[in-house]
Amino acid sequence: METHEARIKRMRMRSWRRGTKEMDLILGPYADAYIARMDEDALNVYDALLEENDQDLLAMILGQQEMLPQFSKLLAEIEEFSRGRLAKG
């Protein structure tokens, strides 16, 4: 059984080491900022999101593909976080 700390560590690592650099730069900072504060339900959704294909996720975030219903709220939060982060830079 994976401990909570091990799960967070695994999910952060998977957020930074995706299949594409674009998704590394989107999910990595988001995970650093929010994953430690997520409740169990939010962690389950984020963990499932990490199983999705990077090209599909990027297309959903960019509005080029319809968001999967189970991820729509989370992807909207990630998109807002990323846009805010880039606006500061």
Where are the predicted features?
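Positively charged, polar, low-complexity stretches
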Residues: 2-89
